[in-house]
Amino acid sequence: MKLKYVKALVAVTVALGVLLPSTISHAKSFSGRSSSSYSSRSSSSSYSGSYKSSPKSSYSSGSSSSSKKSKTSDDSSSSISLKKKPSEKASSSSSKKSSGTFSGATSKVTGKTYSGKTSKAYVGGRYVSVNHYYHAGFAPSGWFGYYSGFTMGMFMISMMHPWGYTYHPVGGPGYVSYGASPIAWIVDIIALIIILIIVIALIRAFKAPKTYRRRF
């Protein structure tokens, strides 16, 4: 009987580890804020800024309305500053002028976390330009700064939006887009099977045993 309670306790611990979101972030330069250009049909300004991130990463991006590029620094501190510049010609087509390069290693997918190609996404009843595109499975706030399919954020996103997801990060001027990932689909199915096994084990552990009576 004690063995069943031990198994149940282990199952609860594993379930909490699977479902609780992770607070570790190794991709600090992409957490919450973005310095890439942003434009939409109602946009009238562009943003450019400088990043100070870890020595392992550097980032530079061009403003959508000017040729000036943001400065990068190898300072060990993690900070961000944004300067707003008025745009002379801001429209939905201004994002075509934006350009960006990525170098360094903020995750295990070195050189693949950022795409300079600007894509369009329909968010909040309008089309917006997405300059930050994270490849399938990448999560800035996930475990190891890489694939966080077992954290609540990416797990729910990949389950509810299997073909990709675009959203506006809190405090950020730009939009972030996650692409579809067959690997994420497979991992999500495996995670669902594991959760189902844990639930069945909990039900069996706490279920009252049946008693049989024989008459002689």
From Swiss-Prot:
Location in the cell reads:
Cell membrane
| Lipid bilayer topology | Multi-pass membrane protein
Where does the chain cross the membrane?
5-25, 137-157, 183-203
Reading the lineage from the top rank, the first entry is Bacteria
Compositionally skewed regions (Low complexity) per UniProt: 28-67, 89-108
Region annotation (Disordered) maps to 28-115
For this record, the Gene Ontology CC terms, alphabetical, are: plasma membrane
Which coarse location class describes where this protein primarily resides?
A: membrane
Mind listing the UniProt keywords for this protein, alphabetically? Cell membrane, Membrane, Transmembrane, Transmembrane helix
What's the protein called, per UniProt?
A: Uncharacterized protein YxcE
Q: What is the lineage of its organism?
A: Bacteria, Bacillati, Bacillota, Bacilli, Bacillales
